[in-house]
Design a protein with these regions (language model features):
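Left-handed beta-helix
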Residues: 34, 40, 45-46, 51-52, ...
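Terminal amphipathic alpha-helical/low-complexity segments used for targeting or macromolecular assembly
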Residues: 1-36, 134-135, 141
Length: 141
């Protein structure tokens, strides 16, 4: 289990136990230590890892990330101007460096989002998407 995941679990525990001030203090420390913004109310599944301690990652508080995902540095997940809803990431997903996942988007299980991809639409299970806007490159076998 990597450091940022443990840090987030502490923030999340404080938040769910209505210790919001302490959760926000820990969040502020995490921004300084890890140069990442992972809000305490965010749901992150067990086994998810952030290599490079999520350096430069920014997430909206209501984004949901499934189990056993790998999220590389510089990833942004959040809202999209003029659209309602936020990203939901399935299980066993790899999100490449500096990818952006924006709006009411679901990333399917066992999928890969390539480095620098801009995801604006749902991604099915078991595929690799790349580009701006992200398009299916191939199946992920």
């Amino acid at each position: 289990m990597d450091r940022i995941f443990v840090w987030h679990k502490m923030e999340h525990w404080l938040y769910t136990h209505k210790l919001n001030l302490l959760a926000q203090i820990l969040r502020g420390g995490g921004k300084i230590i890890f140069a990442a913004d992972i809000p305490p109310q965010m749901e992150i599944g067990e086994g998810t890892v952030f290599p490079h301690d999520a350096l430069g990652c920014i997430f909206h508080p209501d984004v949901k990330i499934g189990k056993n995902c790998k999220i590389l540095h510089g990833v942004t997940m959040g809202g999209r101007a003029g659209h309602k809803g936020l990203p939901v990431i399935g299980d066993n997903v790899l999100i490449g460096t500096h990818a952006q996942i924006l709006g009411n988007v679901r990333i399917g299980n066992n999928s890969i989002v390539g480095a620098g991809a801009i995801v604006l639409h749902d991604v099915p299970d078991n595929v690799v998407v790349v580009g701006n806007p992200a398009k299916i490159l191939r199946e992920n076998k």
